[in-house]
């Protein structure tokens, strides 16, 4: 038996999570400063969300053969502009997906990441973008709980309307 999830289903699930977190963080803006990795690259929830969105931008730029952005240009502590940036990148990703043909999606290409060439298909990189984001939303949920907040519920795919 073959069970599968489509990129469209995973994209819808990811978008549901973004919307849920955006709505919650607008009403709990102090949570943006909650610690994630105090001595690491993502010291706060806001900085981790900024990372989610810039990584999506950079991987999309890789797929399109464009120069890579170095940063979002945002502080990572103001919910509306940060999520607006993420929504803008997501619209571009959705447009890329609409234009991507099946053959092109499965053609192995070389992607330069961290000064190393990685052979992979655009299909793999697209799934990675979404799985990368979903893993980080789980980290956000844990950080929110550890900071004493009650996060928005029903994050599991089980509760999602993205697929039946």
Question: What are the residue ranges of the model-derived segments?
Answer:
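Short, contiguous pre-domain boundary segments
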Residues: 1-3
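Solvent-exposed, well-ordered amphipathic alpha-helical segments
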Residues: 5, 15-18, 56, 84-93
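Short, contiguous alpha-helical
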Residues: 8-25, 30-72, 114-164
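Helix-adjacent hinge/juxtasegments
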Residues: 65-105
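A mid-sequence interfacial segment
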Residues: 91-127
């Amino acid at each position: 038996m073959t069970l599968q999830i489509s990129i469209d289903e995973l994209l819808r699930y990811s978008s549901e999570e973004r919307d849920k977190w955006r709505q919650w963080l607008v009403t709990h803006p102090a949570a943006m400063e909650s610690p994630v990795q105090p001595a690491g690259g993502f010291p706060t929830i806001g900085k981790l969300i900024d990372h989610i969105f810039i990584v999506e931008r950079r991987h999309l730029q890789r797929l399109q053969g464009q120069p890579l952005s170095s940063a979002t240009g945002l502080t990572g502590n103001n919910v509306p502009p940060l999520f607006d940036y993420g929504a803008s990148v997501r619209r571009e990703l959705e447009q890329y997906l609409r234009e991507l043909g099946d053959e092109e999606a499965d053609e192995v290409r070389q992607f330069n990441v961290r000064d190393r060439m990685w052979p992979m298909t655009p299909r793999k990189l697209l799934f990675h973008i979404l799985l990368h984001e979903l893993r980080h939303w789980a980290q956000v949920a844990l950080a929110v709980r550890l900071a004493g907040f009650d996060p928005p519920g029903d994050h599991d795919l089980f509760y999602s309307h993205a697929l039946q």
